[in-house]
Amino acid sequence: MEWRADRFAGRDDTGKVVAMIGRLRELVGERPLIFTVRTKHEGGDWDPLRDHYRDLIADSCASGMIDLVDIQYLNPAAKRCLAAARAHRVPVLASNHDFSGTPAAAEIATRLEAMASFGADICKIAVMPRDAVDVANLLLATATRVRTSRVPLITMAMGPLGAVTRLAGQVFGSCATYGTLGDAGSAPGQQPLPE
């Protein structure tokens, strides 16, 4: 389960965030808990100051209650967030979300490699396709990159055009997808799951 802390009313107070992580840990039990703070630049609901973004990541990792932390690898605080995750032995999902379009397949593959070089344990990219060719480019980049990747990849195209990437991404090398409980997903095109 992913918890999007950028959507939490108490997000300005790291103590409240850590307390909520504790409550969520109790609710999800042994199921993996992913901690995410998505900034507006990458489709989130909030723009924390750089130090606050880092503090939220560091404190969530220090809590000992999360299983994976999502770090936007292009965020100015990314390297310090990675250091905090490593200090607490929390695996890192490096992510990049492009709501403006879909880069060429070679650029997608380059971004995925950059995330692996950054130190990610899992690399994730989400793009916004304009047409079927964009969807095909994402799938091509995934299938090409997975051949030489040292880490698992999660790739998806958002919106209605991208549905095929969420439902059949594993055929091309994506190791996971994101869905939603209920109607309100955190990104366009997330498939609803039964409760």
Report each predicted region and the residues it spans.
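Glycine/small-residue-rich loop that forms an oxyanion/phosphate-binding "nest" at active or ligand-binding sites
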Residues: 33-71
